[in-house]
């Protein structure tokens, strides 16, 4: 009987500990999501403001960096930093495409451009697979369109990375 009570108490304490933990959201992406130093620029990435929409029970960690693509975020080691901080149950918000369109949407020499249906897709799959392998939850965020317009004033897509997902 003592063993059953001990097992039950251990289970309840473990469960209470799990529910007491904060929910953590890690954001990865480019300048449209990145943090900026206040008072030095009027620019703000949406990831910088995300915490304002949640209670203190949710913690936002923004890893997004200006100029990064799905390729450069990995190749510069930023993704490794995120993975080292992931815990089971965490969320990873993934938004790339803005800089993946560099080099006319091809695998570029600058280390940023990716082809929409090959390398771009491969990097996105990597983020999903590695996030899930660590017990976390990947969430794709629709890329923000670039400010390219036709003469008629409609949005003119320069790449296909928004549909490459």
Which ranges hold each PLM region?
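Solvent-exposed, charged interface segments at domain starts and junctions
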Residues: 8, 21-24, 107-109, 117
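Active-site-proximal flexible loops/turns
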Residues: 9, 37, 71, 102-104, ...
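Bacterial Sec-dependent N-terminal signal peptides
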Residues: 1-21
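Alpha-helical cap/lid subdomain in secreted, periplasmic
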Residues: 77-165
């Amino acid at each position: 009987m003592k063993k059953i009570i001990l097992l039950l108490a251990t289970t309840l304490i473990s469960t209470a500990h799990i529910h007491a933990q904060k929910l953590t959201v890690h954001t990865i992406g480019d300048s449209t999501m990145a943090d900026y130093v206040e008072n030095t620029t009027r620019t703000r990435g949406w990831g910088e403001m995300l915490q304002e929409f949640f209670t203190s029970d949710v913690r936002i960690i923004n890893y997004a960096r200006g100029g990064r693509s799905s390729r450069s975020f990995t190749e510069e080691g930023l993704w490794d930093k995120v993975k080292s901080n992931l815990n089971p149950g965490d969320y990873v918000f993934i938004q790339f495409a803005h800089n993946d369109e560099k080099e006319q949407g091809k695998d570029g020499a600058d280390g940023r451009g990716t082809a929409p249906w090959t390398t771009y897709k491969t990097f996105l799959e990597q983020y999903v697979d590695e996030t899930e392998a660590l017990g976390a939850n990947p969430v794709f965020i629709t890329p923000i369109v670039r400010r390219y317009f036709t003469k008629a004033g409609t949005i003119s897509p320069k790449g296909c990375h928004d549909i490459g997902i």
